[in-house]
């Protein structure tokens, strides 16, 4: 006796074709089942003519999840005679936000008329400016969330009062392989040169 399993794949960035799923467990007859199916252009993977499951349902897992996604949890599914069981899997993109703290390179805190507030920074994807942020009175800002990738950087665009422009390009360190969950936070300490440094 056999049945079918349909896995429906979705993702935040709509990449659903070519994803491999594994179905494994022990059938009602005591036979080990270990099968693979790949999603089509619509994100559907079909396991056909699978031996019906026993009291313990089969396990379904996504295989070789792309590094940009959080690995979805395994699911279980019973296979019943002449029925189609459906399970849905969603890929969630790994995201990051960064808190940047600007400080005085020499003293740590601003000297004289200098201030850490009002410096304008850009967050760049490759060479493209994506957003601008302005430091608060504590010399800080926190970005919104962005999708993890290897080429995010922070650059100072306009220094705050009493400081020179720091032209250093700082890598964010938001490579997707560093993370396993959806929401990730990272920090960057930015020391700024004052005119007395030159």
Locations of regions flagged by a protein language model:
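Solvent-exposed loop/turn and edge beta-strand elements of beta-rich ligand-binding domains
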Residues: 1-192
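A short, hydrophobic C-terminal helix/tail in secreted or cell-surface proteins
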Residues: 193-198
């Amino acid at each position: 006796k056999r049945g079918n399993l349909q896995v429906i794949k979705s993702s935040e960035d709509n990449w659903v074709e070519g994803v491999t799923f594994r179905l494994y467990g022990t059938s009602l007859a005591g036979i080990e089942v270990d099968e693979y199916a790949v999603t089509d252009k619509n994100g559907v993977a079909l396991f056909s003519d699978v031996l019906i499951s026993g009291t313990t349902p089969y396990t379904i897992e996504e295989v070789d999840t792309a590094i940009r996604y959080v690995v979805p949890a395994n699911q279980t599914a019973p296979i019943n005679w002449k029925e189609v069981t459906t399970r849905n899997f969603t890929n969630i993109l790994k995201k990051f936000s960064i808190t940047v703290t600007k400080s005085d390179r020499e003293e740590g805190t601003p000297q004289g008329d200098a201030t850490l507030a009002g410096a304008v920074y850009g967050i760049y994807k490759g060479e493209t400016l994506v957003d601008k942020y302005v430091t608060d009175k504590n010399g800080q800002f926190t970005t919104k969330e962005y999708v993890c990738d290897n080429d995010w950087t922070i650059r100072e665009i306009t220094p705050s009062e009493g400081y020179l422009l720091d032209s250093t390009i700082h890598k964010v360190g938001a490579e997707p392989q560093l993370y396993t969950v959806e929401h990730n936070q990272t920090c960057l300490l930015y020391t700024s040169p004052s005119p007395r440094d030159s």
